[in-house]
Amino acid sequence: MNIIKELETNVDWNRVFGVVDSLYSDKGFSSNADNFARATMVEKALDKFSDIKRVDQNGYDFEWEDDKIELKMGKNLFYKVKDPKATKKFKVKSFLSETKTVEDFRQISTFDWLLVIALTARRVVVVEDEHARSLYQEGADGAMIALQDGDYYECNIGEINPILPPINLSYLYQQADQHFLNF
């Protein structure tokens, strides 16, 4: 079985997108500082509701069989009117404190597949690593990518009927904070 078939048949996208809907409508998450917590929980949801394992390694986020998968996700990734099969530019690699260039990132393979989840449009697309690296562009603080029709395979994930968690994550975080600081 390949990764595309795995994504199309063995991921409970109703629950994954239920987690997404819950996190992005949670009024307790109101600042950019909350983005890391939300992204991490979406990764954990994909791990829990599939056989794709979250490993959170440098250069890739998941493993499935012998494949390494880098996940990128965002709201409003695909154009709505201009070209619905094209994405806006999004960051795929960060320079951080490294002295790397976009050309360096084009040469270094750290994953086999780039998995892109469009959170609002509920679309899941996959790009083969070598092709993804050929599309890297210079960004302010890292390598950016913009996908066009033909650059990716769009997974057929069917109609999504989100199943939301019964409680908001921000509430659980508040409870954990209170317990942690209660000494």
Language model feature labels by segment:
Residues M1-F183:
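Nucleic-acid endonuclease domains
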